[in-house]
Amino acid sequence: MDRVNFSIDQLLEETSKLVSLGIISKQECKDIMKKREYHEIKIFNRNSHKSDFLTYIKYELELDRLFHKRGKAKNIEFDYRLRSALRHAIILFGSATKKFPKDEALWINALNIRMKRASKEGTGRLFSIALSNLPRSAKLWKLAATFEFEVNKNIQNARNLIQAGIQFNKTDKSLWHYFFLMELTYISLLFSDITFIDKKIEEEEEEAIKLNLDSLRKSEKIEKDEFITFGKEILSADKLKQSSLIRGQIAQIVFRKAIKSSIGQDFDFRKHFYKIASKFLDIGKDSENPMGAGELLQKEILESLVTDFPNDDKTYIFLASIEQSKSSEPSLLKRLNNSTKILNQGLTIIKSESYLFNYIHFIRQIIVDIKLKENKLIENITDILLKAYKYSIDNNILKESGYQYYIELLLELGKTNDAIKVSEESVKLFKNSNQLWNQRINLLIKNEMVVKLFDNLSNNNEYNNIDKCFEMAVKNCTSSTTSTTSSTSTSSSSNLFIEYFKYQVVFKFDKDYKKIVDLFEKLLKQLDEFYQKCILYEEERIEKNINDIRSLYEKCLSIKEISSKDVDVWLNYRNFELKSAGDIERANTIATRGKKSLADPLPLLSQLQ
């Protein structure tokens, strides 16, 4: 409690000065001190948490804003006495970071407050302490470099800090990106004739962030890497402005070093450099140099992507997106053609279905930006999509999913005849594909008149006969499931049977169950699941036939594996007779049969009671 009282006494002295200045009243002073006493007790408690400090700091920062606002109204906004709450908040941050030295967020909050609201005095020392505690924090290294670059106006110290951060965080991409951005920002400031104070580099500069990097490397077991070094001519703003380096060669050095690092073979890592460079396209551009720093850097970045990622889908998609977004080419049609050339080049090199999907997705996205009246452009896009699919078929690139999407596209474009032809080709190529057979059968059902015309022209092609297709699908898909015992494969086959069953019920007036059920029993292993789905489907139909449902239950229970073990089937059958059919006598008979047939009838008996 003595520590609390001592702290309160010191705070009261400073707060009383605000009363004498007329910033707050005596009653407000009492209320503030009472609130502070509450917070002081919380933070001096042995079991205090970080949240206790942050709540107290938040209160002090709110007081600082209030005092500053009232001081401004009295034209005394720059009086040092007004900043007592801010000074106290900074002291509280110091206590919090001392108690929780490994808390990254706490350090960053403390440093941001110092940089935004306080003077820079002592901030460099605080950065040194923070980095010594958390040398693996990329965020802290970036913030430290920002402080040296933007506050201290010391580009060389900023370079050294960001490179030290890279050494301690070799897999962090953001540090390399920040280094690149910082160098481009620096030359942008110089090129724009913005006054940038270029202090003389001195080892004993008072507010610079000083770190014993050798000691820190040793404690963190980090191997020493040589920093990128720069000649004296670029340490002087005046000399740099007159140099060819103003056109991005410093950033170029950073990029080349970055792609040689352990993370340099990451496509997206390199791609981000291109995006950063796009903000500095015209830096260094003049009558003698038609390309600015950003343009030159982008050119090199693209060359590196093409050279090092020649078989990566992302390379050609990215190059195509650049062509598509070029503002220098006003014609959307020309941009589309240029993008398509790049995408086609990628297709001939990569020859994979995944690349084709990316290609198609890219082209489809363009449609979103097109006005409906631009029919010519839409026709061009349609032609591009169809040619890409045709090339893929001719070169055996298309797999099951590819055919499925191609058929959907043809239907979307109103090319039903072509869709039916391609669908036939697909099931011949991929005989064991549930998805393609389902697609084929649905096509036949929905386009019966077209199919009949095809049938007359093709001498009764069995692939145009719905029943034949179902039978071929059932046989082919079931034979594949016997070799592939996964639950997914079995479920897919079962679903195919269900679709066939629905078709028989809806479209076949004679409802020839015997034919279809015989086929199921012969080919399908998990009959319980199949019958349950069929029964559920029949029970939910508006025009349900009770005898048909009974027939399915009886077929299901004729299988010993089901009748001796599956309690649910017996119970569902009994409840069906009781609730849907209203036949109590039959329901009781089924219950009795269940008790006799089940190996363990107790679960059924407990449900019947």
Swiss-Prot record:
SMART domains under this entry? HAT
Where on the tree of life does the source sit, at the highest rank? Eukaryota
GO MF annotations, alphabetized: snoRNA binding
HAT repeat residue numbers:
84-116, 118-150, 511-540, 544-579
Which residues pair up as cystines? none
Location in the cell reads: Nucleus, Nucleolus
Principal subcellular localisation of the protein: nucleus
Give the UniProt keywords, A-Z: Nucleus, Repeat, rRNA processing
- GO BP: any one term: maturation of SSU-rRNA from tricistronic rRNA transcript (SSU-rRNA, 5.8S rRNA, LSU-rRNA)
Q: Which GO terms describe its cellular component?
A: Pwp2p-containing subcomplex of 90S preribosome; small-subunit processome
Its function? Involved in nucleolar processing of pre-18S ribosomal RNA.
Instruction: Report the family membership.
Output: Belongs to the UTP6 family.
Q: Please state what the protein is called.
A: U3 small nucleolar RNA-associated protein 6 homolog
